[in-house]
Amino acid sequence: NYMQEPSSSAAATFTDDSIQKCLNPLRSVNHEPPKDCSVYIGVDPALGSNNCVIAATPHEGKLKILFIREDLGLTRNEQILGIVEEAVLQCGRNGSSVSDVIIEAMVFQKGLSRDERLIEMTQRYGFRVREHLTGMNKYDETIGVPSMALSFMRGDIEIPYADDPSTRHQADQLIRQLKAWRPLKRGTKLRQDQVMALWFIWILYRQRKQSFALDTSQFNYKGLPWGSTMPARQVF
């Protein structure tokens, strides 16, 4: 159990209290998505190390994580794309479907997000691919990972935490990374692939939530790390 592990909470971006607010003991990663929902998938791709996929849906005023998948030691882009397709199919139950797949597009991943097989998948399943361009923006207090902490404090993000082995394993891995995350600590020294994949989804969730609450002509999209050239007004 993650709560039994020591941590230096003084400098934590994501505190035990805020994480605790987001745990749902009645939801399992084995449950179907809520009925007729749009699902977002965040992908932090990696060959040789930790490849992470997270699926979440905006539902009942929260961003609800459906499941987290991590694979080690992948050697080919085809394997990553196969995992993405499996995630899309897993989310396509109970009348729900994937609307957006957000993929880190720095360095080698740029080729992945523009792979013909992925483009063919978008045509088959009807989702849009977004390239996420991570740089120093992940430390930004208004759009970076630290800004996601407020959603945890408010309980706006839901982590499944039913008492079954799959759910606890997936949730506890994410929670460990959240508790350990610190600004300006390099990913080579700190595991953060799951935090990154969740952040990709959360940015889109926040962007859409705010655009519904505000007149979009007044909303400032500056700083959003999308590689897409699609105007914001056409996203929704």
Go through each PLM region and give its residues.
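ATPase catalytic-site recognition across NTP-hydrolyzing enzymes
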Residues: 1-43
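Short coil/turn segments at secondary-structure boundaries
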Residues: 1-5, 11-19, 104, 159-166, ...
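Mg2+-dependent endonuclease catalytic cores in nucleic-acid-processing enzymes, primarily RNase H-like
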Residues: 9, 60-181, 232-236
